Curated annotation (Swiss-Prot):
Chain's gene name: ypeA
PANTHER family noted in UniProt: ABC SUPERFAMILY TRANSPORT PROTEIN, N-ACETYLTRANSFERASE
Sequence ranges assigned to domain N-acetyltransferase in this UniProt record: 1-141
Annotated Gene3D superfamilies: 3.40.630.30
InterPro entries found in the cross-reference section: Acetyltransferase_YpeA (IPR023072), AcTrfase_GNAT_prd (IPR017255), Acyl_CoA_acyltransferase (IPR016181), GNAT_dom (IPR000182)
Top-level taxonomic group: Bacteria
Family affiliation: Belongs to the acetyltransferase family. YpeA subfamily.
Gene Ontology molecular function, alphabetical: acyltransferase activity, transferring groups other than amino-acyl groups
Keywords: Acyltransferase, Transferase
Top enzyme category: transferase
Protein name, as recorded: Acetyltransferase YpeA
The EC number(s) this enzyme carries: 2.3.1.-
Length: 141
């Protein structure tokens, strides 16, 4: 397995992976999300590749105060092999190299399987409530 930065030729394969991982929501246009990330800071957009196939992704961010991770997903046939752990570990190392003191990950309430994985990796529940506001409307996906 190789973990590397997203390349433009990964575009369609990544969207297909996100569909298989049930990461897409109608209010988020994955093509726009990728385009925005590539134009902002592609170095924190990582893919895991096995035998030339993209089997995992994580999209990270850092605003100078805290890091974040989004679109963490692993192809269902490749789960249980440590790929998600490896992606998060690589992202954490990149964030630490930038001086990032902490990372935040938002997880849907009903995603118990992933919550357990994050807890095993040292992530803790916070008492903060996450609020959001759409600033630019995307086309429904």
């Amino acid at each position: 397995m190789e973990i590397r930065v997203f390349r433009q030729e990964d575009f369609e394969e990544v969207i297909t992976l996100w569909e298989r991982c049930d990461l897409l929501r109608p209010w988020n246009d994955p093509e726009m999300d990728i385009e925005r990330k590539v134009n902002h800071d592609v170095s924190l957009f990582l893919v895991a590749e096995v035998s030339g196939e993209v089997v995992g992704t994580v999209m990270g961010g850092y605003d100078g105060h805290r890091g974040s991770a989004y679109y963490l997903g692993v192809h269902p046939e490749f789960r249980g092999r440590g790929i998600a752990n490896a992606l998060l570990n690589r992202l954490e190392k990149k964030l630490i190299a930038r001086g990032c003191p902490k990372i935040q990950i938002m997880v849907r309430d009903d995603n118990d399987v992933v919550l357990g994985m994050y807890e095993r990796l040292g992530y803790e529940h916070s008492d903060a409530l996450s609020l959001g506001k759409r600033l630019i409307e995307d086309e429904e996906y």
